[in-house]
Amino acid sequence: MRKNLLRILKEKDMSMTKKGYISLYDFVEKIIGSKNPVAYASKIKDHNPVIINEKEYISPESCLNILKNAKFAKCRELYNNLQVKDGDKTSIIDVNNNIFQFEGKRFTSFFVDKRDGKWDVWIYGAEVARFLGYNDDKKAISIHVESCNRLIFEEIRNNFPIESNSIPKTLDKKTKFINLSGFCNLIHHSKKPFAMKIKKWLDDEVIPALIMDGVYSMQPKELKVKFFYEDNYISDFLLRVIKNRE
């Protein structure tokens, strides 16, 4: 993300130091798009500025943090786009920014607040089914995903608050979404060799990270699959974790 951000900032002709610090004023004016950069910058907290010639400069990490927490939709969109580039094989799950991505494949998803301080994720079922090698995504979801683990988009909107700017314009109200348990249902019945790899990813890394702070991120790396796991073990473990958190 840092490398991608610096590339964009250079394209915007931002004032930067040799050590990579960015002018706070330039960042707020050219990237955030504030009409009053001075006032906006004065309200930003915990950015640890470096003062050079009476001007504030901040690190790329601070810039990313500002983008992530900005109220403007275009800032959140830029933050999300920084995480996915052509050829990128990053795996990311971010509750606050509706990101569910495995090795560069980002699924249309919505992390929803269940009004009790807990959250749930609903993922575009057809995208998951096709990714896992099912020839007929509708049939796969109907047969393998339990009814309690799937909803059409209209039901999600009626039951959970969703920001309108996070909804793709082409999304039909009858589109089927599945939750994490449904995701595991499809993984379990997939015949693709990498399905076990995804099971291990969810089991070993994603669930523990999400329970801790609601965000999971990893850089591409080879995952060595342990085939001594029984087929049902990981899916059952995930279902127990999810059930215990509800």
From Swiss-Prot:
* InterPro entries for the chain: BRO_N_domain
Record-linked SMART domains = Bro-N
Question: Which branch of life, at top level?
Answer: Viruses
- Which residues are in the Bro-N domain? 92-214
Q: What is this protein called?
A: Uncharacterized Bro-N domain-containing protein L2
